[in-house]
Amino acid sequence: MSRLEQQLAFICELDKLKEIIRQTQILSGSRRENTAEHSWQLGMMAFVLSEHANEPVDAAHVAKLVLAHDIVEIDAGDTFAYDETGYEDKDAREQAAADRIFGLLPADQAAELRSWWDEFEARETAEAKYAHAILSLIHI
């Protein structure tokens, strides 16, 4: 498979994010949001609210982290905050999903996007901490 074919396979896989219905209602209350909408809104929040971060952050990098963080839901599903059973194997499901989905990309891009996901999950950098802060804010 050519580099372009690998990239397009990944892009087509991302379309599945539109089918994952989350527990969170959109503000109007008319329906629940999907994961693609959730990720897009977080990406915008990364830029718009970055001046309020506790420490300086690279907003573009934060956007990468939040855009990558829920890609694993394509395989692992959205584990709801109150789903105790779902949390039992959440890490294993998400690791396997990350391996498969990011693995659709050419090796260099797979490693880069996987590093964004890993950074988000680790919550160690200023950008990852801010990403988690806006993730908490989106549910208010």
Outline where the language-model segments fall.
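Residue-level recognition of specific faces of alpha-helices
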Residues: 10-16, 41, 64, 70, ...
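Conserved small/polar residues in nucleotide/adenosyl-binding loops
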Residues: 139-140
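Short, solvent-exposed segments of well-ordered alpha helices
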Residues: 5-8, 26-36, 121-128
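Alpha-helical phosphate/pyrophosphate-handling elements in metalloenzyme active cores
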Residues: 31-60
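Divalent metal-dependent catalytic cores for phosphoryl transfer on phosphate-bearing substrates
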Residues: 68-120, 127, 133
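Alpha-helical scaffolds flanking conserved acidic
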Residues: 8, 55-66, 127-130
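Active-site flanking loop/helix segments enriched in acidic
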Residues: 13-41, 81
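Active-site alpha-helical segments that house and flank conserved acidic catalytic motifs
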Residues: 44-50, 60-79
